[in-house]
Every structure is written in C-alpha cells, then in structure tokens.
Amino acid sequence: MKKIFFIHFHEAELKEKIQPLKQAGYKVEHHFSVESVADLQQDLPDILVICLDRLPSHGRRYAEWLWEAKKRQPILIVFCGGTPEKVLITKEKLPKAIYCSNEKLLATLEKLKQ
C-alpha cells in the first residue's frame, strides 16, 4: 500500500480528512503546524497530499521543496481542495502535480495505486 504524507494547516480538519484514507488501508503520516516544519528528509512518502483549503502558499512551498532535488521528483504530489483562484495559482507553479477536490481525493489516490 502506498505511503502518504498529508499536509493541511488545521489539525481538526486534517484528522477528518485522513480518516477515509486510513480506512482504505493507506499508511498516512501528517503535518498541520505552521510553527514547525514537517520532516520529509528521512522517510520519503510515495505520495505527498497537500490540502489547499488553508494557507495554500505554505503547501505550495512544501511541494516546491520536494521537487527541487532530482531524487525526490518521482514522488507524486496531489493537491486537493482550495478555491479556484488558489488552485489556478498552484497549477501555474506546479503543472505536473495532480489536482482534485476534497471529495474525490480517495478516488484519485485509488487510481494512482494501479
């Protein structure tokens, strides 16, 4: 099963969003704090999921950092949620990422595991 690292900057919402993924059998690690940085250096995920509903610029920065190094470029990045304007800005900066609504996140991840 794919290992997912989920970033969303609201703890209660994050716990709600990762529950269906865990129930589907995914191993999900997560980060919600703006006061600390997620440690992705040692144990890289198969997929980085970033919710654009809150602080989308912070999430974009994680994605940019991840793909800065060639060894991390094969890691898939999935952005979910966000206003149309924030999604458009993110697509302009990271066109190779995958985009979906919050409601279609699990279905999108299921397609990626094939």
Residue spans for each PLM region:
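Alpha4 helix (beta4-alpha4-beta5 surface) of REC/receiver domains from two-component response regulators
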Residues: H58-R61, G81-C100, L106-A107
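Acidic, metal-coordinating helix/loop segments flanking the phosphotransfer/catalytic sites
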Residues: F32-I47, S57
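Conserved phosphotransfer microenvironments
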Residues: L48-K70
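His-Asp phosphorelay/catalytic-motif detector in bacterial-type signaling
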Residues: K70-I77
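The C-terminal output helix
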Residues: K111-Q114
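Conserved acidic carboxylate
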Residues: I7-H8
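Two-component/phosphorelay signaling modules centered on CheY-like receiver
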Residues: E11-H31
